[in-house]
A protein has these predicted regions:
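Amphipathic alpha-helical segments of tetratricopeptide repeats
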Residues: 90-98, 132-139, 171-182, 216-227, ...
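DNA major-groove recognition helix of helix-turn-helix/homeodomain DNA-binding modules
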Residues: 43-58
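Short alpha-helical DNA-recognition segment
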Residues: 13-32
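Residue-level signature for tetratricopeptide repeat
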Residues: 79-80, 116-118, 156, 201, ...
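A short, Lys/Arg-rich alpha-helix, primarily the initiator
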Residues: 1-12
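Structural motif corresponding to the intra-repeat A-B loop/turn of tetratricopeptide repeats
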Residues: 83, 120-121, 153, 160, ...
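Helix-turn-helix repeat elements of alpha-solenoid scaffolds
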Residues: 80-94, 118-133, 163-176, 207-216, ...
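"A position-specific structural signal for the A-helix of alpha-solenoid helical repeats
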Residues: 71, 75, 105-116, 145, ...
Length: 286
């Protein structure tokens, strides 16, 4: 905390310690804060800052800026993963100094690093290590990172074709999101991550009906929360499932067109290329 910012602001407004503290705390409390660094209660500090027409966060300028930069970088990594731009995600991950992360940021970093490694088919032992750090003391870790760790481990086992173990972890993740309350756009993304990859697993083992149930749930969540970034991948997997289930060709084509539209909206070039290949196969009647 940079107390000098507080003192400078008080002096800029021409307030004495007595005038500023009036109705909030004793002048002695304010003096101990300004002269000796004895921080008062958050309630008192908030009221003092309000009287100075400033936010408490302004007393932590370097931390606030650093956190903001790191959070934006983590946001970008998460979006790269959704957009299937795994190499870009990996480069950003490499640029992060873990020593500068808060506890919440470190949890998020571990989940993102684990997913990037897994989706790029890197060493499974490393991926397990990242996810297991989140599970090692799950009583302290935010619930969303627990169900994301379960999903990541499910993906590892799916890639190994160890489907019984994969299903065990995907089911644990699904069970957790059933009781999870979505409170932010970030929460939407993480719940959709579970649903999408669990649906991918069930499609892989040819349980298309189960996969579709999860995907339709994802479509509903996107609609309720007005987000589109996962819709392209959800619609494309629905199209693939419909194709494998030998649904009406018109339905498959409509789903693939929807997927392409959302992929263009979200600038997902990787998925657009996959959709084009799929649509060419449909056109040839393969």
């Amino acid at each position: 905390m940079d107390i000098q910012i507080f003192v400078n602001r008080r002096k800029e407004l021409g307030l004495s310690q007595i005038e500023l503290s009036e109705g909030i705390c004793t002048q002695a409390t304010l003096s101990r804060f300004e002269n000796h660094g004895q921080i008062p209660s958050m309630k008192i500090l908030t009221l003092l800052c309000k009287k100075l027409q400033m936010d408490v966060g302004e007393l932590f300028p370097s931390v606030a800026i650093k956190d903001s930069v790191l959070n934006k970088k983590l946001d970008k990594i998460e979006f790269n993963i959704v957009s299937m731009e795994y190499e870009e995600a990996e480069e950003l991950i490499k640029s992060i100094n873990v020593a500068h992360l808060t506890t919440q940021q470190e949890w998020r970093y571990l989940y993102l690093k684990g997913f990037t490694h897994t989706l790029m088919n890197k060493d499974d032992a490393d991926s397990f290590f990242y996810f297991n750090q989140l599970l090692a003391d799950h009583s302290d870790v935010d619930n969303k990172y627990i169900f994301l760790a379960y999903t990541g481990i499910g993906l590892i086992y799916m890639n190994q074709a160890d489907y019984d173990k994969a299903e065990y972890f995907f089911e644990k993740a699904i069970h957790q999101i059933d009781s999870y309350t979505i409170e932010s756009v970030e929460d939407v993304c993480r719940v959709l991550t579970v649903l999408y990859y669990a649906a991918t697993f069930y499609a892989t083992i040819k349980e298309y009906d189960t996969s579709d149930v999860l995907l339709r749930r994802g479509v509903t969540i996107c609609g309720e929360n007005h987000v589109t970034y996962y819709l392209a991948r959800i619609k494309y997997l629905l199209a693939e499932n419909a194709y494998e289930n030998k649904f009406d060709k018109n339905e498959v084509e409509e789903l693939s067109r929807d997927a392409a539209a959302f992929a263009r909206l979200n600038k997902n070039a990787v998925l657009l290329e996959k959709i084009k290949v799929f649509q060419d196969r449909l056109a040839k009647g393969e």
